[in-house]
Amino acid sequence: MKNLFFTALFILVSVNTVAQLEKYPVFEGCESVDNEYLKNCFKTKVTDAVISAINLPDELIKDDFKGNVNVVFYIDREGKFNVLQVNSPYKEMKTEVIRVFNELPKVIPAKYNNHDIEMQFVLPITIPLNSSLESEPKIEELIVDESVKEENLGLIKSDSLQLLEHHSELNLPYTHQAYSNIERYFNRGSNSHTAVKPYTYTDIEKYVDLDAQKNALMKSKSTWFGKKLLNEHMVQVQGEDYWFTLDPIVDLQVGKDNSDIDYTYNNTRGIQFQGGLGKKLSFSTSFYESQGRFANYVNQYAESLAANNDAGGNPAIIPGRGIAKEFKKEAYDYPVAEGYLSYTPNKFLNLQFGHSKNFIGDGYRSMLLSQNASPYPFFKVNTSFWKIKYTNLWMWLRDVRPEVTEDGVFKQKFMATHYLSWNVTRKLNVGLFESVIWENSNDRGFDINYLNPIIFYRAIEFSTGSKGGNALVGLTAKYRFNDRISVYSQLLIDEFTTGQIAKGNGYWGNKSGFQIGAKFHDAFNVENLFLQAEYNTARPYTYSHKEPVLNYGHNNQSMAHLWGSNFNELVGIANYTKGRWYGTAKVVAGKKGFDLEGDTTSYGGDIYQDYDDRTDDFGVKIGQGNTTNIFVGDLQVGYLLNPATNLKLFGGVTYRNFNPESLSTKFEKTNVTWLNIGLRTDLFDWNFDF
């Protein structure tokens, strides 16, 4: 092949058996090789045969593809090559690889205890264009999680990592660090959609081999304790058409800020139960029992979100987690439960029903739908075909303010969202967003009008009455300059009047939010270095409503940006990973307008205030009210203890400067330094950058 050189790593499955493998498979040309050299001969011959036979598809050349195509295959007891998986976003490459392996000659199969056995292998083929033809293929072994079955004894021989969830309909838990790593592989695909999160593992495996990634991190351990601590799920059961895993969850943190608090801590213990029934149905459930006391500014913020105390004496809502009750002195007890069912009846549809969170966007923040609020019940339908991914999402939310709480029961509200993602070209993606919120008034319940997956919600808002609902629309875009660099944006429109926009008179009703950002994967040719810069802004009164129960919120938290509205914000992020070690750095700087203490006027920063209490109809500008400059810097380093459960050791420091223009007992100028260390199962992000 012209101007093309493949380097390949031929990876042998490692097995733990009561005896050593008697004989490696014998490829054509290796018949006379001594047994001790047979493995190297086999790997070299197969690698050469595959590389020399592959004709690189035009699509890869056109897209200037660079990266690995991982081929998982096995040699059966008859000596025939069988391809199990080709990890490539290009179907043409998959077809070509399967063709090549089907044409390989039969070999003498491997032997164990004098019986022919199956053996499985992974062959990652690295494809750099215009590489030096003088380079030599580098052959290495890797511990890979597969089983070798001995024919007569029925013995399963394995000491390596089995991650069955990687081939299920479960979601990869959403954290910014994990998804920034995954997205770089999505960017190499010709028809990937990255905005709707979390991703299912079946979506991810089209672009990246998670098994190979995590097996590369595996520690060689012979004891049960060592394997469970560093490599495996605590409990795993697998049958012919089902599997289950059971793992403990911990989030144990201790720290100190520069306030009068003796120390900060978080003590979370929990359990996660996951599984699959057949190939189409998967489930996950997690329960967390937690007690904690945080840095003083976080405690104050949590108490400012407190639910109606008459409904049960709840002093706080822990940001992103849920309602808390008092625990000992200046601490909180906050249980959280999450879970969902995921069902994929065919290649076009995925259905999910559960109690968790969702995210729409390509940024660190989202102006459309974020994971800032507490978990909520939802039903989601993802439909994928051609260059389209269409998401319908129905959510059951709560308003926990005392004004709407009756007999200790919180007010129920509902939200329906749909998002259309279209890959216009391989590099350009655009998205259309629409969402509506309505309350359970007049025993209205879940209004069937909003079950239509393709209706325009703004029309329904008017057809169901002036207080029928609150609709928002949005537009997104993402452009990939190449596999490593991309830019993205969001435009959110709550309300607007075209004539007033043209006049530029600061009309209050032009309520909108905007985001623009850029990502740089493997920045400056440093592998696993990720950089991101982002700007977010929302005009005053965005996401609010004259009937506050119809605002864009849940459990006294914004369903979009953490800061609500009436702000400008800049975000800079750097992530770096080396093996099991990682480091993250984040800087957030912005300006936000708060309401003035003792003043009932709404300045547009609190989405739970009635916008009819606004300052004026014109001259409305971002930062009005108690203008406050906010700076948050966060640095964290850590070590991944267990790739299967994402258990991490970490230490970090957070610095926060909060500088309001008008000082009061509620708004004080503060400089906070918060040191923290801990051990946690990293299944979600803590967002304390407010």
Question: Which ranges hold each PLM region?
Answer:
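Charge-biased low-complexity segments
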Residues: 5-7, 17-147
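Exposed, low-structure sequence patches enriched in small/polar residues
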Residues: 334, 428-690
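Outer-membrane beta-barrel channel domains
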Residues: 149-429, 436-440, 503-512, 519, ...
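Generic short beta-strand segments
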Residues: 105-106, 248-254, 654-656
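Residue-level preference for beta-strand/loop junctions
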Residues: 63-67, 117-119, 265, 333, ...
